[in-house]
Amino acid sequence: MSSEYYTTIGMDVSDRTTKVCVMSKEGRAPRVVMETTIPTTKEGLAKFLSTQDAATPVAFETGTHCRWMNEVAQGMGFKVYVANPCRLRMVTDSKAKNDKNDARMIARLALADPGLLHPVRLRGAEYQRMINLHEMRGLLVKQRSGIIVQLRAVAKSMGFRIAKVSAAGFHNLDRAAWPKELRDIAWPMLKNLEQLAVTIKTYDKLIRELAGTPAFKAQVDRLMEIHCVGILVATAFVAVTGGDMDRFERPRDVGPWSGLAPKQDQSGDVDRQCHVTKAGSPLLRRLLVESAQLIMRDCSSDTDLKAKGLRICARGGKIARRKAVTAVARSLAVLMTAMLKKPDAPYVPLSERCEKELLAMRAMV
C-alpha cells in the first residue's frame, strides 16, 4: 500500500539535537528537499514545524523524547507517526548508520508507506504517570532488597545469622537483636531502610489514589477479582496496555505481546525449543511472574491457573517449576485480557474439571 503523502518529515532524535530530513516525491522520484539540525527542545521543535505545512506528516522513533514531541506536533495540527525501532532493521542494522542517514530512511519509509514504520500508539498521560510511579517504587524496592541481602551476607561472614523477617519490617529489628560486632555496621543502613520504607509507602498511596480515578477504577476492580492479583499487578496491567483491549484481537495475543511466549524457530522438520522472547514491558512481566509464583504456592487457593502450573510441574525435569511459573504468568495475562474484554462475564476461579484434576494429583502424592 503506497503512501497518500507527497512530502514527509523524518527525524532522528538525540538527547541534545535532532536531525531533520524533509523528503518529497511530487513529480519525480523521492528527493531530499531540506536537511537541518534542530535543538531537542519544545521550543526548537515548534519553531521548525511552524515553517512547515501542517498537512505534512512527521515521523520519528520511540524514545525518551517521543511523548512530548508527539504532543507538540499534534498540537500544531501535524499527523505524527511514532516508529517502532525494534521493527526497523533497515535503520538499526544499516552499514552506514548515522543520524543523518537515519532521518533520511525514516522520511523515505513514511513517504513510501507509513505502515513500514510499524507505528505505535502512545499511552495517555494518566497511564504513563502510573507506570512512572511503578518504576520509581520498583527502584526503591530493589535498593531495599540489595541492602538486606548485603547485611545478611556480612552477618554470615562473621558467623552470625539474622532472624527471618519480611523486607518491609527488616528495619524494625531491635538493636539488641544484632551482635555487638555488627551494630555499628548495620545501624546506619537500618536507618536508611526505614526511610526507604516510608518512601515506598508514599508511592503505594499515590498508586492507590490514581487507581481510584475514572481512567483506572472499573478495570482495576475487575482484575482484582482474580486470586493473587493485587492493586500493583492490576494497575500495572491497565497502565501498560493503556486500558485498550481492542489492540488484542484475541486474549491469547497478549502472551507474545508481553514477552511471555517462547520464540519460534521452525523450518521443515526442525522445530527448536526456544526461551520466551522477553518483549514488551519488563515491569509488567516481572509483576505477572510474581503473581504466578503466589498462585503456585501450596497455601494459595485452588484455581484453574494453579492446576495448570501443577500439571506442568508433574511432568518433571530440571526446570519444570520455572516453566510452570512462566506458563501460569502467561495464562494470567490471557485471563486478565479476557476479563477486560468481557467485563460482564462472571469470573469462575476453579472449574469442575480442574477441581477433580487437583484432587487426583493430591491423591497420588
Locate each region found by the language model.
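A detector of single, family-specific signature residues
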Residues: 1-365
